[in-house]
Structures are given as structure tokens and as C-alpha cells.
């Protein structure tokens, strides 16, 4: 019985972690383009009116290919609105959130998630 409870806990924890992977829970809008032990590069296209599922990122950089207006829903309940401009490059701290395109055109981004800290070139 104790073993079954432990096994169930491990499965539940693994599903929660996987459920917050942006490329898994938002597979229609986010595609992994490259991944190694230091970074994961994803392409995201969010059509007008679409709201993503809640997901998490480690520290990451956004490169805006095609901007637009968005609404961000943070895990702490804070809701903010903003606008990406074409060509913007933005650093973001780790976050659990969902984003919604509130504009009238698709938002197209490259996301670079940073897996390791202090990996400066020598």
C-alpha cells in the first residue's frame, strides 16, 4: 500500500511538471526548434483571440518577429496588458503564466529558455 501511494505521488508530480511545459500544453501554438543542455529555442505563433494554457518558463529571452497586443495572466492572479513591437528583444525572469492575444493579428515570437545560470563565454 505504501509503495502504491509513493508511485502514485511520483506519477502525479511528473504530470504536473509536464503539464506546465509550454510546448506540451500549447502544442498547437508553440514548437520546439532546438534544445540542448543549456537552452531551448521555441517558435510561438498566437492567433488573435487565442489564450494559451497555463505554463512555466525558466529565465528566458523573447525575440519578436511579429508583434501585437497581449494580456498576461500571472500565477499570482495579476493580469497585465502590453504590446510587443516587431524586432523587440526582451529578457524575462522565470514565470508561470498564460498569455492571450487581444489584438487583431497573429503574434509571432522566438523564445529562448535559459537552462543554466552563469554560462558566460570565456
State what each model feature region is:
Residues 49-52, 90-100:
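Histidine-centered metal-chelating micro-motifs
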Residues 118-122:
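Extracytoplasmic/periplasmic copper-protein system
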Residues 35, 76-94:
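Short acidic-glycine-tyrosine-enriched beta hairpin
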Residues 67, 94-117:
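Ligand-binding loop in jelly-roll beta-barrel domains
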Residues 5-15:
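Bacterial N-terminal signal peptides
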Residues 57-76:
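Glycine- and acidic-residue-biased ligand/ion/polar-headgroup-sensing regions
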Residues 17-20:
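Boundary at the C-terminal end of the N-terminal hydrophobic targeting segment
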Residues 27-51, 58-62, 112:
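A short glycine-rich, His/Asp/Glu-containing loop-to-beta-strand
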